[in-house]
Every structure is written in structure tokens, then in C-alpha cells.
């Protein structure tokens, strides 16, 4: 088995908090120097690399003299603001030793949910890569409260992979890779060398919490691989403690767990829809509509909608869920939530008489709909 990284031309590397900090006590400059050296060699080998790095909050805690990670959102935001300065400085210094320029890019979920901002971010990152710059990306912890409380950079790594149409995502952690159970609790746990990304069995294998400094457990990495696979990118989950792990992966050595993407990828527009993390509304659809969407590749008509939940405007991305609340698809709605409530369960021929106008005969056209 050969590493999928060997054939990848555009790679997103996510480095966790434990791999760039001294047990949460500020940044580990020596470790960051080693990451810079390895990425520099990948660049020489002709690969484009985007780095997603944690560590801002841990560095901020060190600079502010805080021993324990605070629980208050505003204190976490303050630590992130202070720490981001140090994180950017260290990376700039270490990459500069190899004549490589770096760029700091701070993103929020909102940046990727808005279509225009999404395209702007994509253009910026692709331009930086064309200029030979290594973008160093982090979530903008200072302004996004829900990211600090619930988010993780594994998800961000997958989103960035899809954003730039990367070939592979490498998630480096303090674990060897994926096991069938938590090896710290179950001595019978088996290591998983390779699997198909996005299967329910993988999610069942994944454990929960991570370390006290980082926020992501193995489940977030499994879900990140599932998300990246939608754009055709393979994911490798490996230990960042392995010597020269990036160089060895690029040379073809199989290290860690490889989660392979199924054949085929979503179009860029449908990938953008699939990557929405926060949706303002959803529609409950009947079994007939579920069948038409999942098997027939049809559009969603108002007659198949049994309930409208949340408040949304025309042109927003909404979820389509079955009677049990399971999301089966999402897409761009042709009608607002208020309009959708009026035309739900009605044939398309009655839309104009009910609303006084007809935008489209479909609530969501199949070209603007993606299965999840």
C-alpha cells in the first residue's frame, strides 16, 4: 500500500495544538521549525501546500500568564488575539530560512457560507499558491464565538481542501491513526490502515474527546475526511510524532490511516452547498420526495414538503430532512420560508394563485440540490 500523498499535487496539512505547543505552554519553536523544514522539502518536490495550524489560544495563554484554558468566551477570544501574533511571527521566521514567504489567512464559517466571500477566499488562496507562498490558515477565534466553543481545525482543514480543490488532506495528531476502538481503553482494538471515507462504520469506531489543550477528537477527523471526500480528496490521519512524517508520506510510505475518497467529485457549486455548517432553515419532506431526490435525481417540488422549519430568504441554502429528521439533501431555495409555508403540500400549478407570482415551479431545482 502506497501513501496517497505521493501522487497529490495540492495538499492541505492540518497540525494540531499538541504538535506545535509545549503541552499547551506556548509555542514549541523547535517543532514548528521541523514542520517548516518538511514543508519546504515538499515544495521542492513540486507540491503546493496550505497549512492549517492550531496554537493561537495556547500561545496567548502563555503570553498572558494563564495556566488553565479559560471557559469564558471573551477570555478565549483575547487569548486568541494575543497568540495569533506569535503564531504568525514564528512561522514567518522559520519558513524564511528556506526563502519561503508565508501569508496569514483567518477565516470564519460565515466567510465560506456566503457565496461571494467564498469565491473571494478561493481566489486569494489560489493566487498565493501561484506566487509560491505558503498560506497559514486558522479560524478567526477572536470574532467567532461558536467556533471557540464547538469548532475545530479538522473541519476547517476539510473546508479549505474543498475550497482550493486539494488532492489530499493530511491531519497530523498525537495518535497513530484510527482504531476500531479506543486503544487506551480496549486492548483488542485493531489499527485501521485504509478505509473508504464517509462510511457509518468509521463514525462508529471514532472516539470522543481530545486533549485539554486541543478541542478535536477522532470523530471530528473522521467527519473531516468525509467532507473532504465529497470533492474527491483523500485524507491521511497520522501521528505528528513520527520523524519526518510529511517527507515520508510524500515519498510514498504508508503511515497512519488512509481514508480514500469514492470515485467522482461534486461540482464546485454543489461542494459549496454541501460545506455549509450552519443552515437557517429546513423543510421536512415525505417519503415520495425522499425517493425522488435520492434515487431519481429529481427536483424538490412544493407538494412533497410537509413542514417548513426556521426562517430563511430566497436564495439561501436549506436542508431537506425526512420524517425522522435525518438530512437527505440540501440546496438553494427558490422561495422564502413564509412563501414555502403557503405552498407546501400544493402542486406547482397552484403556486401563482397562492402567492400571486411564480418564481420557479420547484422549491429547489435539482441543479441547485446536493445529496448528503
From Swiss-Prot:
Q: Which GO terms describe its cellular component?
A: cytosol
- Gene3D superfamilies associated with the record: Acetylglutamate kinase-like (3.40.1160.10), PUA domain (2.30.130.10)
Where, by residue number, does substrate bind?
54, 141, 153
Q: Does the keyword Cytoplasm apply?
A: yes
Check the record and name the PROSITE patterns matching this protein: GLUTAMATE_5_KINASE (PS00902), PUA (PS50890)
The annotated pathway is:
Amino-acid biosynthesis; L-proline biosynthesis; L-glutamate 5-semialdehyde from L-glutamate: step 1/2
| CDD domains named among the record's database cross-references | AAK_G5K_ProB, PUA_G5K
Pfam families linked to this entry: AA_kinase (PF00696), PUA (PF01472)
What top-level branch of life does the organism fall under? Bacteria
PUA domain location is 280-358
Question: What subcellular compartments does it reside in?
Answer: Cytoplasm
Which EC class is this protein assigned? transferase
Q: Where does ATP bind?
A: 14, 173-174
PANTHER family for the chain: GLUTAMATE 5-KINASE, ISOPENTENYL PHOSPHATE KINASE
Q: Which family does it belong to?
A: Belongs to the glutamate 5-kinase family.
Protein name per Swiss-Prot or TrEMBL: Glutamate 5-kinase
